[in-house]
A protein has these predicted regions:
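Surface-exposed polar/charged interaction patches
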Residues: 15, 19, 45, 66-70, ...
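Aromatic-anchored, charged helix-turn/loop surface patch used as a conserved interaction hotspot
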Residues: 42-89
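Intrinsic-disorder-associated interaction segments
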Residues: 9, 53-56, 69, 85, ...
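N-terminal interaction modules that seed assembly of large macromolecular complexes
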Residues: 6-62
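Amphipathic alpha-helical binding modules
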Residues: 93-143
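Histone-fold modules and their flanking histone-like tails across chromatin and transcription assemblies
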Residues: 1-3
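Short, surface-exposed, charged/polar-biased interaction segments
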Residues: 29, 33, 37, 56-63, ...
Length: 143
């Protein structure tokens, strides 16, 4: 989820400490609605945040393992193989995010390579992983 929960909580504290009642009841009511929505999103993220990141990282690594044998660029192939062999050492969100960001940067590199080299099957596999990632991160406000 972006922004991350610490950012949402800090913003909430700023809103509450900033004297929202000074601007009138309508403004305060709007701010409280916004804060309530942010807290609901934070609760949902808290519940599923680690699971989403672990699944994404696993899917990306599996994709790299599948793509690497077809890559002719030696440097990219080595990066894909190294990333595919990696694993998440911690379930801390900050550590999972760091791994996820690094994997996503390499995924972008792999996608550019696939597009530049007409590797349509690789492109389709990449898009399937991206679609699954987007579906996992979808946030619904209802129950």
């Amino acid at each position: 989820m972006n922004p991350e929960i610490p950012t949402i909580l800090a913003l909430t504290m700023q809103r509450l400490a900033g004297g929202i009642t000074e601007h009138g009841a309508a403004f305060a009511q709007g701010q409280m609605g916004l804060i309530g929505m942010m807290m609901t999103l934070s609760a949902k993220e808290y519940e599923r945040g680690a699971e989403i990141r672990v699944a994404e990282n696993s899917d990306i690594r599996a994709l790299f393992a599948a793509l690497a044998p077809e890559v002719k660029d030696a440097a990219l192939k080595a990066k894909l193989e190294a990333a595919a062999a990696g694993k998440d050492e911690s379930l801390l969100i900050s550590k999972l995010n760091a791994n996820n960001y690094a994997l996503r940067r390499l995924l972008t590199e792999a996608q550019v390579y696939a597009e530049d080299n007409g590797a349509r099957a690789a492109e389709q596999r990449i898009w399937a992983v991206l679609k699954a990632m987007a579906a996992r991160r979808l946030v619904q406000l209802g129950p």
